[in-house]
A protein has these predicted regions:
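FAD-site-proximal beta/loop scaffold in flavoenzymes
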Residues: 156-172, 259-336
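Short hydrophobic core segments
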Residues: 8-10, 114, 133-144, 179, ...
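Conserved phosphate-binding and hydrolysis motifs of nucleotide-dependent enzymes
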Residues: 11-16, 144, 180-185, 270, ...
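Glycine-rich dinucleotide-binding loop and its adjacent helix/turn
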Residues: 47, 143-198, 202, 231, ...
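A Rossmann-like FAD-binding core segment of flavoenzymes
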Residues: 74, 108-111, 115-127, 195-296, ...
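Beta1/beta-strand and adjacent pyrophosphate-binding region of the FAD-binding site
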Residues: 2-13, 172-182
Length: 465
């Protein structure tokens, strides 16, 4: 088997495997090196298994509250291990599908750990430590990222968790403190609360979900606190100590220090790129805050070397990584009409209860950039489908440029908003204005009508409020 390739990709996550498939489709001799599992964090320990667990928890919640619809049920019991097994089975099914697609498109998968030993030169060590050399005209780094630790608070796999342990608990802890309230922290807070765990959520910033619009963040916090989740913002966990029953945590906010004892602690303070032992230093690869620096076509400062996905910097999202994989391959293959990534068109989704979805600028960011804005907002409480479904918690908020009509941002909180945000993504991608969106017809009754009503409100033409 040949050891020279047009493209060699290091890392088989959503960025790497999609890049490999596209390269194979374009007729490029392609190899993919993966040291653990095809599908990366997303399919194995992130996006997919968390959604399976969240689905189970939400079903349990719906059954528990079915009496509101006149449906009587007995006591609801969740077999945690069966739920975990279901999530693992879903992941395995999808990773098997990735393996099939790579084979179908002529991609050679190499098991092992890769490092660069020169321009276009790669050495791969297999599980036995034996090394093999390869050459490629183009090398793509798609090595992803891993959970970040805090000084003095290191995961131990038993009492102090990362998402690895949180996805496959041996038993449900009675209490859980989550450090960090980004998408990962908020999703696990929602999950464990629905399963019956007492959850405390701690965030250093002034709001949970710090990257989201302030109104959306406030709505999620209000919902969480109503459910019994304790939320502390502008608070830092300064120390953890193991006890006979769990972990004693020292927390400090702007005015005081407090203590909390819990059975488990989950670190959800972001990720750090996997750049160690790749050989970047010897090649002089430029970094930006620890991430590999790239241009709009995913090229590094070293000719023939590219980086995509989490290792190339935020937003650390699977769909952004996959899109970069396609952009990278089509650029190096000379495909006409390839467009660079528009970061303002990258949707963000948080699958908590209530769900959160957004794209583009928040209100505060738009104002900080000096954009004149017109804002529309519509509540689920006035939406017929939401009322019929008993899902009245939430709203849709749209932000337009007051002068040009450009859609600057869309922010949604509530049931199924992660399935609706694509509508705003299409609108922004096609450069639709408020005027053109006004004339769209939305099916009735649907939750998506709240999208249209928010646009109408932004244009001072509200119909149902």
């Amino acid at each position: 088997m040949h050891d020279n390739y047009d493209v060699l990709i290091i890392g088989g996550g959503p960025g790497g495997y999609v890049a490999a498939i596209r390269a194979g489709q374009l007729g490029l001799r392609t190899a993919l090196v993966e040291k653990q599992h095809l599908g990366g964090i997303c399919l194995n320990w992130g996006c997919i298994p968390t959604k399976a667990l969240l689905h189970g928890a939400e079903v349990a919640h719906s059954i528990t509250h079915a009496s509101q619809l006149g449906i009587s049920v007995g006591e609801v019991n969740v077999d945690l291990q069966k739920l975990v097994q279901f999530s693992r089975a879903v992941s395995q099914q999808l990773t098997g599908g990735v393996e099939y697609l790579l084979k179908k498109n002529g991609v050679r998968v190499i098991d092992g750990t890769a490092r660069l030993r020169g321009k276009g030169q790669i050495t791969v060590a297999d599980a036995r430590g034996e090394e093999y050399d390869y050459r490629a005209d183009h090398v793509i780094l798609a090595t992803g990222a891993r959970p970040r630790a805090l000084p003095g608070i290191a995961p131990d796999g038993e009492y102090i968790w990362t998402y690895y342990e949180a996805l496959q608990p041996k038993r449900l802890p009675r209490s859980l403190l989550i450090i960090g309230s980004g998408a990962i922290g908020v999703e696990f807070a929602s999950l464990y609360n629905d399963l019956g765990c007492k959850v405390t959520l701690v965030e250093l910033a002034s709001q949970i979900l710090p990257v989201e619009d302030a109104e959306v963040s406030a709505a999620v916090r209000k919902s969480f606190e109503k459910r019994g989740i304790q939320v502390h913002t502008q608070t830092q966990v300064t120390q953890v100590q193991l006890t006979d029953t769990g972990v004693r945590c020292t927390m400090k906010n702007t005015s005081a220090e407090s203590f909390l004892e819990v059975e488990r602690v989950l670190l959800a303070v972001g990720v750090q790129p996997n750049i160690e032992d790749l050989g970047l230093e010897a090649l002089g690869v430029e970094l930006d805050r620890g991430f590999i620096k790239t241009d709009t076509a995913c090229r590094t400062n070293v000719f023939g070397l590219y980086a995509i996905g989490d290792v190339a910097g935020p937003p650390c999202l699977a769909h952004k990584a996959s899109h970069e994989g396609v952009i990278c391959i089509e650029t190096l293959a000379g495909v006409e009409g390839t467009h660079p990534l528009d970061r303002d068109c990258v949707p963000g989704c948080t699958y908590s209860r209530p769900q959160v979805a957004s794209l583009g600028l928040t209100e505060s960011t738009a104002l900080a950039r000096g954009r004149p804005v017109r804002i529309g907002k519509f509540s689920y409480q006035s939406n017929g489908k939401a009322l019929a479904s008993g899902e009245t918690e939430g709203f849709v908020k749209t932000i337009f440029d007051a002068e040009t009509g450009e859609l600057l941002g869309a922010h949604m909180v509530g049931a199924q908003v992660t399935e609706q945000i694509q509508g705003f993504g299409i609108a922004r991608h096609l450069e639709a204005t408020d005027e053109s969106l006004l004339s769209m017809i939305f099916a009735h009754p649907t939750l998506s009508e709240a999208m249209h009503e928010s646009i109408l409100a932004a244009c001072d033409q509200p119909l149902h409020q």
